[in-house]
Amino acid sequence: MSEQAIRLTQYSHGAGCGCKISPKVLETILHSDQAKFIDPNLLVGNETRDDAAVYDLGNGTSVISTTDFFMPIVDNPFDFGRIAATNAISDIYAMGGKPIMAIAILGWPVNTLAPEIAREVVEGGRFACQQAGIALAGGHSIDAPEPIFGLAVTGVVPTERVKKNSTAEAGCKLFLTKPLGIGVLTTAEKKSLLRPEHQNLATEVMCTMNKAGADFAEIDGVRAMTDVTGFGLLGHLSEVCQGAGLQAELWYEAVPKLPGVEEYIAQGAVPGGTSRNFASYGHLMGDMPDAWRSLLCDPQTSGGLLLAVEPAAEAQVQAVAAKHGITLSAIGELKTARGGRPMVEIR
């Protein structure tokens, strides 16, 4: 079979960050009765479901460590590798850091798909690493029933500039650097619903680096930051609220959306991860139309950065966004928690 004829998405049961284990199931897996090992230098661990682990070296610099891998979300091998690598590197930027090195994680059905196709996947990952200015320095591979690719990435950040998902404050405005709808558009393509003018839109967004995160970290008024991936905007926003003990008001019309997403949702192009996300986080949300839920819970692969910004810092944030070619507008606001109200209200 030629590489051109290969459709990688036919060889996996999941796609991109949409194949994440649901938050509810993950909670069960991660529960432990063992005594917790306390390391005072571990600034960010697993407690707040942040994007990466952060370790203070004690010299003003902290190391960021993360890993991310998944099954194909696109058919093209090179694009799959590039997207998976971009998505993994994003976790470093989301913590306010800069990547310094990556190693590859590859699972490949060697008796089903030719090694030359795997090479193209790795080449896509290498290309993304070069875009980030880092080496793909090694890795590990196994014979697996489905294709899997990703990276383990190491980064550094000035300790005082670490950005967490749990440090937002009431009054902060919310901003999102990429449009939503990646899961919807990729599902529409699988269902042969995607119009010609929307071809490759999702791939372009997924291949866009979140390099702006390192610059946003220089702004004191950026109180919290995370990237929006498999748990959808509402899932990751609820983690921001839970971490800081806040509530949020989200303005649906202001949320950036990929072209055509609402039309494709109406045609049933909704990935399975959407319902899993709502099953995990829906009880924290206010009422909303089904179509809104299908977009706000849509699992994103290599999605944008979600920022909580003090009003006084908005001009600085807009200047950094413009430098990176990003158009930003506020999509909501964080508020002091009030009893009897949903954690996230959608207006």
From Swiss-Prot:
Q: Name one GO cellular component term.
A: cytoplasm
Name the keywords, alphabetized.
ATP-binding, Kinase, Magnesium, Metal-binding, Nucleotide-binding, Selenium, Transferase
Q: How does it assemble?
A: Homodimer.
Cite the InterPro entries for this sequence.
PurM-like_C_dom, PurM-like_C_sf, PurM-like_N, PurM-like_N_sf, SelD_I, SPS/SelD
Q: What is this protein called?
A: Selenide, water dikinase
Gene (name only): selD
Q: Which domain of life is it from?
A: Bacteria
Gene Ontology MF terms in the entry: ATP binding; magnesium ion binding; selenide, water dikinase activity
